[in-house]
Amino acid sequence: RGYSEDKIIKIYRTIDPELLKRNAEGFLNGHTPFSSVVAFISMYAGFIEGANDVILSNESSANESNIGGESVNHQYSKSFEFERDFDEFRRRNFPQSAVYFSLLRPFCELQIAKQFSQYKQYHAIFRSCNRGSKKNIWCCECPKCLFVAIMLSPFLPPDELNSIFGCDMLAKTELETDFDGLCGFTGLKPFECVGTADEVVLALTLTAEKYKKSGLEMPALLRRFCEKNTACADYSLLSGFNEENLIPKKFDECVKRMFEYVSAAD
């Protein structure tokens, strides 16, 4: 049902006119660490509202860097490193403010996808595509759309998965470069909010096993994975639990229930 208007704190941002001027001159925008902006705004909103907690949904997969061998992380402001640094900043400067933490930090993207696959009432309406966000659509042309499809592919029948995107994402050969980056075949992971190569390898391995058992013809990108992949799938990912988190004890039961489901053998 949500909250009534009088219970909502509305915070607005404006674009610096100087940035618009630079854009008109041909300069490109840098990356905006949006999650860090949300962190500071939420801490302020929580303080004036008297809230005890500011709860995020950032997963452990956000900790991985984008460039192999380098500590360059497109998702730094979603990582545990940022969460810890922000908590230290909060404790040092605003000790009475709400506690800032992610309730999904113990879990990886694939575990979250397994949990979400059960909530079919939301499959037609959820979105996780930056390019299509202004139109509330899946663009079906970006690494993010491809990654989400890969994460859900072990847990949904092909027809249900394809109905979410309006197409078979694993058949889109024009996304081979992004696909190879997601799989770890190259040293560069797409600069999008996507999970780890290990998760992608496991997800596609499970999906390939499902196709082989059913006798269905594999889509092009899944065949490409089977032909090119040399990495062993880490099946322990679905039973993993990342201890690097700042979740208060009072939420232990919520986290425990999710862990019991995602770690259970199918």
Regions picked out by a protein language model, each given a short descriptive name:
Residues 1-266:
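Nucleotide-activated chemistry modules centered on ATP-dependent adenylation/adenylyltransferase
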